[in-house]
Amino acid sequence: MIPFFVLAGTFIVCRLIGWAGVDFFAEWQHCLRVAVAAMFFLTASAHWGKRRPDLVRMVPPAFPHPEMLVTLTGFAEIAGAIGMLRTPVTKAASVGLAILLVAMFPANVNAARHKLTIAGSEVPGLFVRTVLQIVFLAAVIAAGWC
């Protein structure tokens, strides 16, 4: 749930800054791009450090080399977040992050079905996780294409 709160909170703060007169944040698309980038920088940070073992456990057994997959997806999240902030590649970053979200969804299903934890807290159930994934996909697509 924390990534959702970062996405929503960053978007709201950016909109408030825009309403206060900062031209860049006057457009909701810019606010959404910054919010998506903030969310993915946050989620990427979990790929290293104390949460890493939890993410490795989330990878379904059918996928080989779970540690490598966690590392690669972390780098992909960072690249996508940077791309969201670089107007010439925003659309490409949007497509890449959308593909990444779909590709990582089996890990979220696995975590929900096995009631795994991240940093000691149980991951959201499958219904909640699916709704969040749809929200994240919509945000990524809207940020890149609107």
Features from the language model and the residues they span:
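Membrane-interface extramembranous regions
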Residues: 1-146
